[in-house]
Amino acid sequence: MSFKVQIRRAAEVDIAEAQLWYEAQRSGLGAEFHSEVSRVIHRLAETPLIYQMVHRDVRRAVVHRFPYLLWYRVQGEDVTVLACTYAGRDPSKVMSRLR
């Protein structure tokens, strides 16, 4: 069964900003970051329940090779990506964005 993944506008902005930052560090690194995020999103469409639930109905998935997390919610057959944040960010500040 494949889940429908929707990405909130705020999460799209998070991803784009991180991608630009990585690209400024080294040419091509931004594309590598985007590719890793896309892999996680693909996994969410296939098996969203494998990732840890961290707050009420919110789960988080790790972006491999990069210190970023995708925060998301599963409701029925829908997955909504709420945010993409730096893994070292204070979790309490992240939680305020997930409502």
Protein language model annotation of sequence segments:
Residues 39, 46-78:
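Basic/aromatic recognition patch in beta-strand/loop cores that engages polyanionic ligands
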Residues 1-34:
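Arg/Lys-rich, positively charged N-terminal/basic patches that mediate binding to nucleic acids
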Residues 19, 23, 38-45:
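Structural signal for well-ordered, non-membrane alpha-helices
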Residues 31, 52-54, 93:
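Short, hydrophobic secondary-structure boundary micro-motifs
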Residues 1, 69, 73-99:
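Enriched for short, Lys/Arg-rich terminal
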